[in-house]
């Protein structure tokens, strides 16, 4: 398993941001902090969901660190990455992504299952198996979908906000009392 040492040049080449100060990035190394920064998928609406995404990112980083010493194939064509990013942004988990190996369209959920399979051993090592398992649920029913379902009922966005506040704050806190709305 990865040791957490400084990334090799092969590993750094897999990260697409030229410098830590670069503004337009998906994943970038932050050597000053010893971290990897990732542009997050939709804002998560519960701490459990945040932990699931963090577990996925940790396990993926561990997978990639392990692969850094393997010369393997060159990074994929930027056009393929851009197309898949567009498809995912437009269609979410309903997207048909382009498989880098076969060039065929593959449901995003199948791609996710492959990724989770690759992450399983790393999640065990990182002790985040329980959190990683939540990613499957998020793929099918995430916070954005829950918010849309709440809003579609009566269209009251204040109720959506109240439900979000309730997901974060226990019902006995002053914050909850301040957001009490008849929904």
Map each language-model feature to its residues:
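C-terminal accessory/tail domains of diverse enzymes
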Residues: 1-183
């Amino acid at each position: 398993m990865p040791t957490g040492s400084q990334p090799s040049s092969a590993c750094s080449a897999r990260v697409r941001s030229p410098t830590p100060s670069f503004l337009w990035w998906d994943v970038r190394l932050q050597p000053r902090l010893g971290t990897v920064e990732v542009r997050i998928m939709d804002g998560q609406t519960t701490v459990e969901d945040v932990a699931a995404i963090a577990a996925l990112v940790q396990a993926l980083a561990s997978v990639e660190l392990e692969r850094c010493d393997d010369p393997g194939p060159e990074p994929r064509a930027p056009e393929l990455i851009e197309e898949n990013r567009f498809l995912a942004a437009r269609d979410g988990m309903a997207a048909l992504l382009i498989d880098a190996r076969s060039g065929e369209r593959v449901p995003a959920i199948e791609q996710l299952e492959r990724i989770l399979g690759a992450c399983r051993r790393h999640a065990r090592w990182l002790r985040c198996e329980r959190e990683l398992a939540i990613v499957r649920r998020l793929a099918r029913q995430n916070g954005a979908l829950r918010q849309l379902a709440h809003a579609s009922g009566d269209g009251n966005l204040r109720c959506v906000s109240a439900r979000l506040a309730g997901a974060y704050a226990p019902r006995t806190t002053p914050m909850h009392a301040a957001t009490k709305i008849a929904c």
